[in-house]
C-alpha cells in the first residue's frame, strides 16, 4: 500500500476515535450526576465529612473532569480496535495473538487494581483521613476529592501491570528469571518513593499504597520465574 494511503487510513481511524470520544463525553456529561454518585461511594458512610466547592465554576470543572475520564474509558475499546486494525496487515499471526493476549491480560489486571483500590483501599483511607482530627469537621473540596481519587485509581491500575510486564520481559528473554529477586532492595526503595509521590504526605496513605505494591511485587517474582524458565 502506498505511503499516502497509509496516512489517509490513519487519518480516518483517528477521526473515528475522536468522534467516538466526543459522543462518549457528551453522554457521560449528561449522566454526570450518576457518575458522581458512583465515585462518591467510598465516602458515603463518613458522617463527619462534607464536600464543598471553593470556586464559582468548581462544580462544572468536576463534571468535565469526570466526563472526560468516563469518555476515555468508554472510547478506549474502539480506539484500540482502530489501532489494531491499522497495524494488523503488517503483523504475523503469532504477533497478533501476543498483542491480543497482552491487551486482554493488561486490561483485566488494570480493572482488578482499580476495583481493589475503589472497594478496599479508598474507603479505609478516606475514613481515616476524615476522622483523624476528632476536634474539627472535615471539609474537603469536591475537585480535590475527585482529583485525588482519580490519581490513586490510576496508580493502582498501573501498579497492577507489574505481573504482565514481568511475563512479557521474561518470555522474550529480555530479563533473567531471577531479575526481580536480585533487585529486591532497589525495588523496595522505588516502590516506597512511588507511594510517597502519589499519596498524601502521611504515613498511613503510604502504607495503604505500599502494601498492595509489595504483594504485587511478590507475584511478579513468581511470574518472572515461571515465564523465564518456560520460555
Q: Where do the protein language model's features map onto the residues?
A:
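Membrane topogenic/interface segments and analogous intrinsically disordered interaction regions
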Residues: 1-231
Amino acid at each position: 500500500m502506498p505511503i499516502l494511503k497509509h496516512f489517509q487510513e490513519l487519518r480516518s481511524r483517528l477521526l473515528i476515535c475522536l468522534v467516538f470520544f466526543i459522543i462518549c463525553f457528551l453522554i457521560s456529561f449528561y449522566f454526570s450526576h450518576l457518575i458522581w454518585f458512583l465515585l462518591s461511594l467510598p465516602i458515603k458512610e463518613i458522617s463527619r465529612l462534607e464536600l464543598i466547592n471553593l470556586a464559582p465554576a468548581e462544580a462544572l470543572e468536576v463534571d468535565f473532569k469526570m466526563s472526560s475520564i468516563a469518555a476515555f474509558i468508554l472510547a478506549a475499546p474502539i480506539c484500540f480496535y482502530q489501532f489494531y486494525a491499522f497495524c494488523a496487515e503488517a503483523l504475523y499471526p503469532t504477533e497478533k495473538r501476543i498483542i491480543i493476549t497482552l491487551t486482554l491480560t493488561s486490561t483485566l489486571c488494570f480493572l482488578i487494581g482499580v476495583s481493589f483500590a475503589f472497594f478496599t483501599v479508598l474507603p479505609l483511607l478516606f475514613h481515616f483521613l476524615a476522622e483523624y482530627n476528632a476536634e474539627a469537621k472535615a471539609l474537603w473540596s469536591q475537585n480535590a476529592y475527585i482529583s485525588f481519587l482519580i490519581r490513586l485509581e490510576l496508580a493502582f491500575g498501573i501498579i497492577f501491570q507489574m505481573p504482565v510486564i514481568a511475563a512479557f520481559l521474561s518470555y522474550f528473554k529480555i530479563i533473567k528469571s531471577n531479575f526481580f529477586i536480585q533487585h529486591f532492595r532497589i525495588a523496595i526503595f522505588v516502590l516506597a518513593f512511588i507511594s510517597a509521590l502519589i499519596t498524601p504526605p502521611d504515613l498511613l496513605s503510604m502504607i495503604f499504597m505500599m502494601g498492595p505494591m509489595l504483594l504485587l511485587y511478590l507475584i511478579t517474582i513468581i511470574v518472572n520465574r515461571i515465564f523465564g524458565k518456560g520460555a
